[in-house]
């Protein structure tokens, strides 16, 4: 993976451009994952989109091959927004469609408020707008202290996926990746998110918004996604059935097709 240097360490990203030569100036879709995973979460989206779009993924600061800060690091949404811009600049993406899952989707809403000039559209997936309403976040620090990362990861897997909802191989990869993440990053992101409340600014978002929601997320009831939907004029909402919080992984192809149909509608207007 190529890297981009920032004032706070390197970020690793990957740009896939397999568009055929007759696709002139393909648009870029930038993907931002959430807590306790890496950019591999998007792997099954790529085949659904790469014939027409440049696919830009990266390991969010704190995960994967990107810089892993220590416990003293001061996390902020603005700092993570600057990371997104650094990745987009490195990939030559002046404008891009933004897709984010969980915390990453909240980042999309933040960018829609604070960096709208760079965005073509925003697709938040199982994402909050008010961290204080995210269920179970407040228990993370004590739970990790008592049960360790393995115990925390086991509980998270139950909340991300229905039993048998993903293949054995993908379940093994996800659980292993999640449990090996830095607890400092997980707690830093979780506690940062608790302080985020974008509620009063959602109505100012003018870029097209396509919300993808799981019908059974233990973290985000559909009522929360509906709040976002009702607060952003002309936003769309697609609810994926029989899915928990990890919908972008368990229902990757379905989510990618939902995104593609949304972008196709934008191109026709």
Language model feature labels by segment:
Residues 243-256:
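Catalytic histidine-centered segment of alpha/beta-hydrolase-like enzymes
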Residues 78-96:
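Conserved acidic catalytic loop of the alpha/beta-hydrolase fold
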Residues 100, 104, 108:
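Gly/Ala-rich beta-loop-alpha elbow adjacent to hydrolase catalytic centers
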Residues 216-220:
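Acidic catalytic loop of the alpha/beta-hydrolase fold
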Residues 132-135, 146-203:
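Conserved alpha/beta-hydrolase catalytic His-Asp/Glu region
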Residues 109-114, 118-148:
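Flexible "cap/lid" loop of the alpha/beta hydrolase fold
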């Amino acid at each position: 993976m190529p890297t981009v240097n920032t004032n706070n360490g390197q970020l690793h990203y990957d740009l896939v451009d397999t568009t055929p030569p007759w696709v002139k100036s393909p648009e870029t879709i930038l993907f931002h994952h959430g807590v306790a995973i890496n950019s591999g979460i998007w792997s099954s989206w790529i085949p659904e989109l790469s014939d027409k779009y440049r696919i830009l993924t990266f390991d969010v600061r704190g995960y994967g091959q990107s810089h892993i800060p220590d416990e003293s690091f001061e996390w902020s949404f603005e700092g993570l927004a600057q990371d997104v811009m650094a990745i987009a600049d490195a990939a030559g993406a002046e404008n891009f469609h933004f897709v984010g899952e969980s915390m990453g989707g909240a980042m999309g809403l933040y960018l829609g408020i604070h960096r709208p000039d760079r965005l073509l559209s925003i697709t938040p997936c199982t994402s909050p707008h008010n961290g204080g309403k995210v269920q179970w976040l407040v228990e993370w620090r004590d739970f990790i202290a008592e049960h360790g990362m393995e115990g925390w990861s086991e509980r998270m897997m139950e909340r991300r996926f229905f039993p048998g909802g993903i293949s054995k191989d993908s379940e093994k990869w996800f659980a292993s990746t999640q449990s090996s993440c830095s607890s400092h990053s997980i707690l830093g992101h979780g506690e940062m998110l608790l302080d985020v409340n974008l509620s009063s600014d959602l109505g100012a978002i003018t870029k097209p918004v396509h919300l993808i929601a799981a019908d059974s997320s233990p973290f985000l009831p559909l009522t929360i996604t509906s709040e976002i939907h009702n607060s952003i004029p002309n936003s769309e909402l697609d609810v994926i059935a029989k899915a928990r919080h990890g919908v972008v992984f368990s229902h990757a192809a379905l989510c990618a097709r939902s995104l593609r149909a949304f972008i196709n509608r934008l191109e026709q207007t």
